[in-house]
Amino acid sequence: MIKLITWEMDRSHAPADPAERIKLTMKHCELVKKGMDSGKTKMWGMNPGGNHGFSITDGDEKEIFAMIAQYIPHVKFKVESMLSIDEVIATLKAMMKQG
């Protein structure tokens, strides 16, 4: 099942020094790229302000926890299960047969 992960930077844990912030952001970007290259992360995006974004994965709960734990405490996450269009149609068809 597809999972939508929305995230928001927690600036209270960001380094005060701009050079250190850039270094931390680069580390996070490298982790994202690693997830994309491995296929675990299907899609990722960040707003132009750099403070929030999204990720899409089909990993299970344990894989997702292992992935997002790398960013804590600098990033806050919300994870939601999503249905594909095929899953929605199949569910609706099953409901139609019952009723």
Q: Which sequence ranges carry the predicted segments?
A:
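Conserved, structured core segments of small domains
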Residues: 1-99
